[in-house]
UniProtKB/Swiss-Prot annotation:
Belongs to the TrpF family. Pathway: Amino-acid biosynthesis; L-tryptophan biosynthesis; L-tryptophan from chorismate: step 3/5. This is N-(5'-phosphoribosyl)anthranilate isomerase. Its EC number is 5.3.1.24. Homodimer. The gene is trpF. One of its GO terms (molecular function) is phosphoribosylanthranilate isomerase activity. Keywords: Amino-acid biosynthesis, Aromatic amino acid biosynthesis, Isomerase, Tryptophan biosynthesis. The lineage of its organism: Bacteria, Thermotogati, Thermotogota, Thermotogae, Thermotogales. One of its GO terms (biological process) is L-tryptophan biosynthetic process.
C-alpha cells in the first residue's frame, strides 16, 4: 500500500488529524520564504505530541548542513527533504547523520536525467517552479515511466489532490505520495475533509 505524507503542517490540530486519518508522515517546511514556513520551536511542539510511529520530515532549501542537522535533532525529525539545488556531496554528508530525501523539480526529460544522479537517496519528484514546491500544479507523469524502475524509493508530489491521486498512483506506482496545497483551506491551514478523502483514495480504502 502506498504511503502518504501530509506536508506543510503548521499546527497541532492538522498534524493530529492527518495521523488519525492514516497519514504515514508529516512534513514541516523550514524554508523562510514559504507560505507554509514553521519555526523549529513550533515544529518541535507539534513533533513531541505525535505518536512515535509517525515519520517526521523537515523540508529545507539550500540550507547549511550544520543548520539542517541542528534543526533535525531539535525537532526530532526522522528525515530531511532537500528541496533546492543541493549538490550530491552535501546530500551524502547529511545522509551520514539522518535519512535524506532529495527533491527534484520536473518539467522535461533533462530533469529526470538529473534526478538519476541522486538515485542513491529516496527521490521526491515535484513540479518544477521557482517557489520550490507547494504550487498546486501537476507535471506530465509519463515523463517518469522510462526511469521508474531505476529509483529504489520514489515519492510523487506536485499538484496532487483527492481527485487525481488515484490516477497518479496507477500511472507512476510510487512508494509514497506527498501533498500540501491539494488538501488546504488556505496556505498553512489544512482542510480536514480533503485530508481524509486524499488518504482514502491514495490507499484505496
Amino acid at each position: 500500500m502506498v504511503r502518504v505524507k501530509i506536508c506543510g503542517i503548521t499546527n497541532l490540530e492538522d498534524a493530529l488529524f492527518s495521523v488519525e486519518s492514516g497519514a504515514d508522515a508529516v512534513g514541516f517546511v523550514f524554508y523562510p520564504k514559504s507560505k507554509r514556513y514553521i519555526s523549529p520551536e513550533d515544529a518541535r511542539r507539534i513533533s513531541v505530541e505525535l505518536p512515535p510511529f509517525v515519520f517526521r520530515v523537515g523540508v529545507f532549501v539550500n540550507e547549511e548542513p550544520e543548520k539542517i542537522l541542528d534543526v533535525a535533532s531539535y525537532v526530532q525529525l526522522n528525515a530531511v527533504q532537500l528541496h533546492g539545488e543541493e549538490p550530491i556531496e552535501l546530500c551524502r554528508k547529511i545522509a551520514e547523520r539522518i535519512l535524506v530525501i532529495k527533491a527534484v523539480g520536473v518539467s522535461n526529460e533533462r530533469d529526470m536525467e538529473r534526478a538519476l544522479n541522486y538515485r542513491e537517496f529516496p527521490i521526491l519528484l515535484d513540479t518544477k517552479t521557482p517557489e520550490y514546491g507547494g504550487s498546486g500544479k501537476t507535471f506530465d507523469w509519463s515523463l517518469i515511466l522510462p526511469y521508474r524502475d531505476r529509483f529504489r524509493y520514489l515519492v510523487l508530489s506536485g499538484g496532487l489532490n483527492p481527485e487525481n491521486v488515484r490516477s497518479a498512483i496507477d500511472v507512476v506506482r510510487p512508494f509514497a505520495v506527498d501533498v500540501s496545497s491539494g488538501v488546504e483551506a488556505f496556505p498553512g491551514k489544512k482542510d480536514h475533509d480533503s485530508i481524509k478523502m486524499f488518504i482514502k483514495n491514495a490507499k484505496g480504502l
